Amino acid sequence: MVGEMETKENPNPTPDYLMQLMNDKKLMSSLPNFCGIFNHLERLLDEEISRVRKDMYNDTLNGSTEKRSAELPDAVGPIVQLQEKLYVPVKEYPDFNFVGRILGPRGLTAKQLEAETGCKIMVRGKGSMRDKKKEEQNRGKPNWEHLNEDLHVLITVEDAQNRAEIKLKRAVEEVKKLLVPAAEGEDSLKKMQLMELAILNGTYRDANIKSPALAFSLAATAQAAPRIITGPAPVLPPAALRTPTPAGPTIMPLIRQIQTAVMPNGTPHPTAAIVPPGPEAGLIYTPYEYPYTLAPATSILEYPIEPSGVLGAVATKVRRHDMRVHPYQRIVTADRAATGN
C-alpha cells in the first residue's frame, strides 16, 4: 500500500559484512571535508557495527542461541556504585594469555562487554600492563596500588540499586566465561579476535576465495583424469661453447699460398726459406680468430705490389721519386735540367 514503509531484515552478522562496515567507517574518517557533516550517517554506521559485533560475539560464546532479554526494570532509589573483582587463574594456567583474551584486539572485546552489560571492565594487578618496565616504575605510586595485587578483572557499575545489581550479575557471568581456557584449535573466541584483527589491519581474506578443501578436490580430479602415455623426451646435446672448425674453404680468399716472394733488391724474401714454394706449403689458418683475420683483407691492397710478386704477396713500400719529399721542395726532372727551367 501507498505510505507503508517496507521493512527489511538486518543482514546476517558475517565477517565479510563487518569488514565492509569497517571499511566504510575508515573511508568516512579519512575524508576531512565530510567529518561532522553526516552525523546521522555516522551514528547509524556505529550502531550497525556494534550490532554485528554483538551478534557475532553472542553466537561465539553462547552457541548461536538467543540471549535472554536485556530489559531492565525502572530505576528505584538513588544512584549507587557497585564493584566486584574476579581473579584470573594464572597459577593454574601460567602459559595462557588471559589479558589478551579479555581485552581483545585493540580492546574491542572489553568494549563490547561494556556496551552489552553497561558496566566498566578493567584488567588490574600484576601483569596487567604490557610494558613491564613501566609497571615496575609505577609500582607503589599513588593510584597504582593495584599492581601489588594478583591479576584480576575489576567490574564497576553506577545505577539504581535494582538495576545495578542486574547489570553487575550479567557482567560477572560474561567475564567468567572468558576465564575458562579453551582447547587449542577449539577456541572460537580466539578465532573471532584474530578475524577482527585481520579486518582492522586490512589483511582479511574474502570468503569468495577458493578454500583449501576445494583445491584438494580439484587436484584429486586432475590426478584421476586419463593421461596420454608418451615416450621419454630426447636428450639434447649440450650447446657448444666454441664455434666448430669450418669444413668449407677459408673465409679470406685474398690470403693464398705464397709461391714466390722477392725483395725489391732482388734477394729472396726471408719467409721463402721458412715456407718453401710448392702447392703443399701454405699459411696456418686459425678458425677461432675470425675478427682478427678479416681485418687485414682491405689493408693489403693499400700497399704497392711488385710486378714479380703475385696477388697476396705483401711487398715493402717503394719510394717514388716523382713525389715531393717536402711540400716546398722543387722537383727537377731530366727534361727541365736540359732546358734550364
From Swiss-Prot:
Q: Which InterPro entries match?
A: BBP-like, KH_1_KHDC4/BBP-like, KH_dom, KH_dom_type_1_sf, Quaking_NLS, STAR_dimer
Subcellular location per UniProt equals: Nucleus; Cytoplasm
Omega-N-methylarginine modifications at:
227, 242, 256
**Can you tell which superkingdom this protein's organism belongs to?**
Eukaryota
**Annotated motif SH3-binding, positions:** 276-279
Name the organs or tissues of expression: Present in myelinating oligodendrocytes (at protein level).
Annotated Gene Ontology cellular component terms: cytoplasm; cytosol; nucleus; synapse
For the modification Asymmetric dimethylarginine, the affected residues are 242
* GO BP of this protein: axon ensheathment; intracellular mRNA localization; long-chain fatty acid biosynthetic process; microglia differentiation; mRNA processing; mRNA stabilization; mRNA transport; myelination
Qua2 domain: annotated span? 182-213
Write out the PTM section of this UniProt entry.
Methylated by PRMT1.
- Keyword Transport assigned to the entry: answer is yes
Q: Where is this region: Qua1 domain?
A: 11-82
Q: Assembly state and interactors?
A: Homodimer; does not require RNA to homodimerize. Able to heterodimerize with BICC1.
Q: What is this protein called?
A: KH domain-containing RNA-binding protein QKI
The gene is: Qki
